[in-house]
Every structure is written in C-alpha cells, then in structure tokens.
Amino acid sequence: MMDIMTDHENPAVTGEDNALPTRSGFVALIGPTNAGKSTLVNRLVGAKVSIVSHKVQTTRAVMRGIAIHKNAQIVFMDTPGIFKPRRRLDRAMVTSAWGGAKDADLILLLIDSERGLKGDAEAILEGLKDVPQKKILCLNKIDQVKREDLLKLAAAANEKVAFDRTFMISATNGSGCEDLMDYLVETLPEGPWYYPEDQISDLPMRQLAAEITREKLFLRLHQELPYASHVETEKWEERKDGSVRIEQVIYVERDSQKKIALGKNGDAIKAISTASRKELSEILEQPVHLFLFVKVRENWGDDPERFREMGLEFPRG
C-alpha cells in the first residue's frame, strides 16, 4: 500500500520540544544527477552547505548538512548523482553515493518529476531493492507536473521498491518540505545529537571554500569547461586586521582549458574570483582576499592525491 504525503497532512508533534527526548540520525539523499538533491539539502538545512549548478554531476563527494527540527538533529548526506560511470572519477563518485546510502539510518530517493523514471532512475530503483534501511520517495519539482501524472509516477516507483512513505515536494519553493521534516523527526531514533547545535556542516572550511569557487567556475563557464577541473585551497591565512587571505588553485588538464578558465584578458577568472570572494565574505563574516591561480596538471583525474582532496576513494583498475 502506497502512503503519500502532501502539504499539511502530517500531524504536528505536540508539547514543548525541549521536553521531548532528543532524536538524531543520518538521512542519505540519493538520486539521478540534477534531481535537485543539493537544492533540497540547502532548503532543509536553511543555509547553503552544498553547491548547486545547472551542470550534472556537480556534487562529487558526500556532503553533510545538519538541520535542527523540533527535538531532532537531522544529518543530511548529499551524495553525488548516480549514473552510469565512464571514467575513474565517475566510478569514485557513484561508489561514494552508494556508500553514503549504506551508512545512513534512512534513505531518501529524490526523483525529478518531469523526467520520471527514465534512464538512471530505473537502475537506482533496482539497486535499492536489496538495501535494508527504511526508504522514502520524494518527487521533486511537483509544480511542473500535473497531479494525475505525479500519482502515476509515485505508483510506478512504489511497484518497484517498497517505500515507507512518498512525499511530493518542491525543493525550490519549499512546498511539502515541512511535512517531510516532521516525518523525519518521528522516524529517526532517540539519541543524543552528533554535532553542536549551531553547526550546519561537517565540511572543513578550506574545502567548503574550494567548493564555492568550483560552483562559480561552473556557473561562469557553463559548457565551455569540461569536468576535468578541480579546485584546491592551498593557503589560508588569518590576518591581524581581521581579514583572511585565501589562495586557491584551479587544476585543468590542458593548456586550452587553462585559456578558457582565464578568459579573454583574464575576464573569466576575475569574475569567478569576485563572485567567490563575495560569498565567502558573507559566510565567514569577515573580509576575504582571494587569489586564484590556474595550473595545468595532465591526467589529474588519475592522481590518488586529488581524489583524497575531494573526499573520494581512489578506484583501482
């Protein structure tokens, strides 16, 4: 039997939150590329903890966003999109996604309602059949699809996998997200919180800074720069005047890619630096002096050290 939740159908937890036993747990978000996982994590956490772009496979490793809702601390694990891997980096990303799912208390499968169960979604459903954790289905972008089609999509997915609950949401405008959070509070086990109350991510600030610059790189260059690029924070210096000096390197594989990253007269790298510096200053609440360098490192995608920098295991063979 399929249990579907939409807006305002979930009873609220009554009583004072601080009088209730605390709950905590890990929720892994999995799904095809560009299903909206990072957008949803940022929405549920209430702050930006995972980068977002229109490009597929933006998330490369598991990112954790930490939300407090009522008496529960919910740790969301934003995993890379699951797709058919072609390169070594692809294999590492997909392995990371399934590894995140296996480590979680609950698995949330996010499906783009417009794309439905085509392609990678079918393969993910097959892979979920033998996963023992409790599973919920979230149909995203419901404002773009007729309700009749949403119900058909939910039924088709539930025929393949026994989901404990199905939610219809919009990660962009927040529709259905409150009901989702209420359900997670009720479902996660009782126990102490894993992180301090004011912590929203477990990502080191140096790595978060690199992720933000990588996002600006994607947003600025669109389809011009292939995925053979990687950003590392090489220097982080707190200065006496209260500012911070950050030096980052954008690694590419060929000179032609370096020219794209720099842009004509350096216009591209200047725009990327300005956008990244602005966001970093807002996050850190202090002035930021950001210096970006572009270096060619052939076949960096075969370098185990680069994988460790991204938080990925290096696949052998």
Swiss-Prot record:
GO terms for molecular function: GTP binding; GTPase activity; ribosomal small subunit binding; small ribosomal subunit rRNA binding. It is a peripheral membrane protein. Residues 23-190 form the Era-type G domain. It is found in: Cytoplasm; Cell inner membrane. It holds the Pfam family KH_2. InterPro entries: G_ERA_dom (IPR030388), GTP-bd (IPR006073), GTPase_Era-like (IPR005662), KH_dom-like_a/b (IPR015946), KH_dom_type_2 (IPR004044), KH_sf_prok-type (IPR009019), P-loop_NTPase (IPR027417), Small_GTP-bd (IPR005225). Residues 57-61 are annotated as: G2. Belongs to the TRAFAC class TrmE-Era-EngA-EngB-Septin-like GTPase superfamily. Era GTPase family. An essential GTPase that binds both GDP and GTP, with rapid nucleotide exchange. Plays a role in 16S rRNA processing and 30S ribosomal subunit biogenesis and possibly also in cell cycle regulation and energy metabolism. Monomer. This is GTPase Era. It comes from Agrobacterium fabrum (strain C58 / ATCC 33970). The gene is era.
